[in-house]
A protein has these predicted regions:
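GST-like domain detector, emphasizing the conserved glutathione-binding G-site
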Residues: 1-131
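GST-like fold's C-terminal all-alpha helical module
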Residues: 99-177
Length: 177
């Protein structure tokens, strides 16, 4: 049986990471039987990143690769009726949401307006993580944001980038440059 390894739940959502939640939702919608294991330590994961699955002894990382694996292995037809235009729309929305993940994650870990509430809620729900451990996770994520690029934005520009990604103000992209 397929086992999904992802970050733990938070705020009533099955996974507090958008990529893990994407895989979880896909597996549920496609009715693929699976076991869901919540982990904090991603060191066993491919490239040290969650989510990943183990399926009949094969370890697969990356949310889109996991979904492609499930479609092929279990002969899923969940998207079979989509037209070419609908497939393009699906791809564009998926890319937008994947880009938006970084902005939202940054808001949780680096934006002082949101970080205290996120930290306190996380520690309250997951007692095995203390403030020191959480600060280490914050430092780790800060490095990830820098190397990904989102950590090099100024906060005002990051908000404009988020608005642009959400298509609420397409002209905001000019201000980000």
């Amino acid at each position: 049986m397929l086992t999904l390894y992802s970050y733990p739940e938070l705020f009533g959502v099955a996974d507090n990471n958008g990529y893990g939640l994407k895989v979880y939702a896909f597996l549920k919608l496609a009715r693929v039987p699976f076991v869901h294991e919540h982990v904090f330590d991603a060191s066993a994961a491919p490239r040290g990143q969650l989510p990943y699955v183990v399926d009949d002894g094969e370890t697969i990382g990356d949310s889109e690769t996991i979904i492609a694996h499930a479609i092929a292995k279990y002969r899923l037809t969940i998207d079979a009726a989509l037209s070419p235009e609908q497939r393009r729309t699906n791809h564009l929305v998926t890319r937008m949401l994947d880009d938006l993940y970084w902005v939202m994650s940054y808001s949780r870990w680096k934006d002082d307006r949101y970080y205290p509430a996120f930290r306190d809620a996380f520690i309250a729900q997951h007692k095995q993580i203390d403030a020191d451990g959480f600060e280490k996770a914050k430092a780790y994520n800060s490095q990830r944001y820098h190397f990904q690029g989102i950590g090099r934005y100024r906060c005002r520009h990051l908000r404009l980038h988020r608005e642009y990604l959400l298509l609420s103000d397409p002209d905001a992209a000019e201000d980000v440059r």
